[in-house]
C-alpha cells in the first residue's frame, strides 16, 4: 500500500549524513520523511566517540555556519575539548571534542523530534521506486510505499555489510545492526558503478580493569573551546581526561605471529581500508621501523565504563585481540567487553554524481556519506547537509547550490569526490585545500552564514548573532584605525616595552596589531587602546583579519585568476571522442570522469592545459561557452 501522505524529500538512513540531510530539508520548509531501521540509534557514533580534528573540525564549523546540527550536539555532549595546532597559524587550528555517546545521541534525537516539517518512521528500506530514470519514492520491508519528489540515500556501511573477526565473518551493518542486503541488490541493478570498501574499529575495554596510575593523563584545554558559533561553555557536561599508552615490541610480535589469521592478510577482505586510520596490523607492517605506537584511551561517556582505545583498530581473532591489549602498559589485566572487527560494504563511485550530490543518471536521487566512499562522521554530515538542501531545492524546482573549493572545505570535499572519485575511504585534511588561509575555522560563519540565510537554512536567532558579530568586528577595527600614536607621545613607553623595535613613526591601532610581537589582548590592555571586546569570537576575528590582511588579499587575487574558467559548463553526456585534437589518454579520462565544468576537468590527472584550451575552443565553436554561477 501507499502511505496516504506524499513528501517532498525522503531521507533513507539516520546516521550523521541522514540526520543533517533531514534537518536541512525540513528547515527549508519541505515536508521531509526520515526512514530508519531503528529510531533509538539516530545519530549513533558507531566508531570513535569524538568529533572534529584537523580538517574535520573545519567541516563541523561550516555545517554549523549553515545552520546544521553537529556542532550544537557536540557542545551538549562533549566531555573533553581541545584546539589542535594551537601554536600554529589560524588556517590549520582545529577543534576536537571527545563526546559522550549517549548524550550526543540524545541531543540529535531531540533536535530531530522537535524539528517542524520532519516525520520519522522506523522501517528498513528494501527498494526504490524509479520511473523513467526518476526516483519517485521508497518501499519498506513490510511493503509500505512512500512517495516523494526527491530521495537521499545515507545508508552508511549497511549496504551488503559483512563483519570480519579473524577468519569468521557474518552479515551486518555494524555490530548489532542488520545489513541492507535487499536495498544493496536493488541499487546494483541501477546504472551506477559500485565497489567495496572496508573500515574497522578497535575492541572496547572495561575502564575498571585498566591501571590508569601507570598511564599519561591528557587533559582538555583551559579555557575550554566551543564548537558552535552559538555555543557556550555552560552547555558542556562534566569534563574528564583521556589517557595515553603505547604498543611495544611484545605487541608487535603478537601481531606479526598471527597475520595468517588476519582476514586482511589472508585475502578474505577485498575492500580497501582507510589510509589515514589504518588497523594496528597495517601500522605494524607498514612502519616496521617503529618500536611503539601511541594509543589514546578515550572514555565513551560519563555513565559508561567503556574505553575506546584509539589506535588499535583490528580484525584479528578475539584471542589475539586479548594478547594485544594485555601487552600494553596499564592494560595487563584489562577486559575486552566488545571485540574489534572490520566491516566491508558497498559504495558507489561519486564520479557518477553532480557536485550537488544528485545522481547524473537518476533524477532526484541524492547520495551522501559513506556510500560515496568517505570515512568519518564529519565528512558524512557535511555531505548530508549539502544533499538535503539540494534535494529540497530539487523538490521545489529551484536552482541547486554547492560551494566552490575556495569557499568551503565542503566544496573541496565534493569537488574531490565528484571529479577524482576515490579508491579508498576519503578523509578530509587541511592539506587538501589550496586556499587554506581563506578557509579557517574561525571565519566559517563569515563565509557561509549569509548564503545559508538566503537558502533558508539559517534561522532568526543565528542570523541575529551573526549580524551582531559582524558589526562588532567592523566597529572595533574602525576604532583601532582611528587611534593614532606618535613617536613623541606621552604614553609611548608602555608600547615600546612590548615592541621589539621602538616606534619610529606614527601608527594607528591596526598598524601596531600587525607587528608579530603584538596581539589583540596585549594591545587592548594598554590604556590608550582599551577596552577590549568581551565577545571572544569577535576579538579573535579582529586580530586575524588585521594580522593576515595582506596574505588574504594575495590569496583572493589567486582565486579570482583561477575562477575565470572554473565554472565554464561541460555537457555531462558529452562523448569526448568527437573533439579532435585530444589525445587518446585525455579522451579516456574525460569519458570516464564525465566532468561537469572546465574546473573539474582541469583537476583530473593527465588532463593537460593544452587539452583544456582545446575544450574551450570546442565549446566556443558549439556556442556552449557559458559560465555557470
Swiss-Prot record:
Its main location: cytoplasm. The keyword NAD applies. Its cofactor is FAD. Signal peptide: none annotated. PROSITE patterns: GIDA_1, GIDA_2. FAD binds at residues 13-18. GO terms for biological process: tRNA methylation; tRNA wobble uridine modification. NAD-binding protein involved in the addition of a carboxymethylaminomethyl (cmnm) group at the wobble position (U34) of certain tRNAs, forming tRNA-cmnm(5)s(2)U34. Belongs to the MnmG family. NCBIfam families: mnmG_gidA (TIGR00136). Homodimer. Heterotetramer of two MnmE and two MnmG subunits. This is tRNA uridine 5-carboxymethylaminomethyl modification enzyme MnmG. The gene is mnmG.
Amino acid at each position: 500500500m501507499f502511505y496516504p501522505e506524499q513528501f517532498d524529500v525522503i531521507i533513507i538512513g539516520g546516521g550523521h549524513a541522514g540526520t543533517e540531510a533531514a534537518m536541512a530539508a525540513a528547515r527549508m520548509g519541505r515536508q521531509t520523511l526520515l526512514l530508519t531501521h531503528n529510531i533509538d540509534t539516530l545519530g549513533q557514533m558507531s566508531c570513535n566517540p569524538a568529533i572534529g580534528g584537523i580538517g574535520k573540525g573545519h567541516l563541523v564549523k561550516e555545517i554549523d555556519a549553515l545552520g546544521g546540527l553537529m556542532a550544537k550536539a557536540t557542545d551538549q555532549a562533549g566531555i573533553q575539548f581541545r584546539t589542535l595546532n594551537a601554536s600554529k597559524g589560524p588556517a590549520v587550528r582545529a577543534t576536537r571534542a571527545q563526546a559522550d555517546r549517549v548524550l550526543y545521541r540524545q541531543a540529535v534525537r531531540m533536535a530531530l523530534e522537535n524539528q517542524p516539517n520532519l516525520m520519522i518512521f522506523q522501517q528498513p528500506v528494501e527498494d526504490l521506486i524509479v520511473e523513467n530514470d526518476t526516483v519517485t519514492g521508497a518501499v519498506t520491508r513490510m511493503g509500505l510505499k512512500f512517495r516523494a519528489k526527491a530521495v537521499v540515500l545515507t545508508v552508511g556501511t549497511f549496504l551488503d555489510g559483512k563483519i570480519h573477526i579473524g577468519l569468521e565473518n557474518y552479515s551486518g551493518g555494524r555490530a548489532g545492526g542488520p545489513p541492507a542486503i535487499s536495498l544493496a541488490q536493488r541499487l546494483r541493478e541501477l546504472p551506477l558503478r559500485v565497489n567495496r570498501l572496508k573500515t574497522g574499529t578497535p575492541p572496547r575495554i572495561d575502564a575498571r580493569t585498566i591501571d590508569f596510575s601507570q598511564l599519561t593523563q591528557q587533559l582538555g584545554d583551559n579555557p575550554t573551546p566551543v564548537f558552535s558559533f552559538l555555543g557556550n561553555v555552560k552547555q558542556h557536561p562534566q569534563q574528564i581526561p583521556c589517557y595515553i599508552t603505547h604498543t611495544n615490541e611484545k605487541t608487535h610480535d603478537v601481531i606479526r605471529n598471527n597475520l595468517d589469521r588476519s582476514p586482511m592478510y589472508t585475502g578474505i577482505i577485498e575492500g580497501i581500508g582507510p589510509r589515514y586510520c589504518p588497523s594496528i596490523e597495517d601500522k605494524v607492517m607498514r612502519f616496521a621501523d617503529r618500536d611503539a605506537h601511541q594509543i589514546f584511551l578515550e572514555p565513551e561517556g560519563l555513565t559508561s565504563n567503556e574505553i575506546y582505545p584509539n589506535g588499535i583498530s583490528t580484525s584479528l581473532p578475539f584471542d589475539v585481540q586479548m594478547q594485544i591489549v594485555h601487552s600494553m602498559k596499564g592494560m595487563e589485566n584489562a577486559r575486552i567487553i566488545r571485540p574489534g572487527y572490520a566491516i566491508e560494504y558497498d559504495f558507489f563511485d561519486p564520479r557518477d554524481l553532480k557536485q550537488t550530490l544528485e545522481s547524473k543518471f537518476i533524477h532526484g536521487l541524492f547520495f551522501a556519506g559513506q556510500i560515496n566512499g568517505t570515512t568519518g562522521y564529519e565528512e558524512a554530515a557535511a555531505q548530508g547537509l549539502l544533499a538535503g538542501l539540494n534535494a529540497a531545492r530539487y523538490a521545489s524546482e529551484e536552482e541547486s547550490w554547492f560551494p566552490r573549493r575556495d569557499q568551503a572545505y565542503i566544496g573541496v570535499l565534493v569537488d574531490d569526490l565528484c571529479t577524482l572519485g576515490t579508491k579508498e575511504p576519503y578523509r578530509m585534511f587541511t592539506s587538501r585545500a589550496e586556499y587554506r588561509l581563506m578557509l579557517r575555522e574561525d571565519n566559517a560563519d563569515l563565509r557561509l552564514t549569509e548564503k545559508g540565510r538566503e537558502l533558508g537554512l539559517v534561522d532568526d536567532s543565528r542570523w541575529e548573532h551573526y549580524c551582531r558579530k559582524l558589526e562588532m568586528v567592523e566597529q572595533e577595527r574602525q576604532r583601532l584605525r582611528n587611534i593614532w600614536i606618535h613617536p613623541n607621545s606621552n604614553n609611548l613607553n608602555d608600547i615600546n616595552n612590548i615592541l621589539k623595535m621602538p616606534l619610529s613613526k606614527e601608527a594607528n591601532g591596526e598598524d601596531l596589531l600587525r607587528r608579530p610581537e603584538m596581539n589583540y589582548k596585549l594591545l587592548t590592555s594598554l590604556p590608550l587602546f582599551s577596552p577590549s571586546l568581551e565577545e571572544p569570537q569577535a576579538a579573535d576575528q579582529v586580530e586575524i583579519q588585521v594580522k593576515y590582511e595582506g596574505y588574504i588579499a594575495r590569496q583572493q587575487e589567486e582565486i579570482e585568476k583561477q575562477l575565470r574558467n572554473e565554472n565554464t559548463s561541460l555537457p555531462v553526456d558529452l562523448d569526448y571522442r568527437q573533439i579532435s585534437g585530444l589525445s587518446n589518454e585525455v579522451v579516456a579520462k574525460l569519458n570516464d570522469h564525465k566532468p561537469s565544468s572546465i574546473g573539474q576537468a582541469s583537476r583530473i590527472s593527465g588532463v593537460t592545459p593544452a587539452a583544456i584550451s582545446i575544450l574551450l575552443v570546442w565549446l566556443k565553436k558549439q556556442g556552449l561557452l557559458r559560465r555557470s554561477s
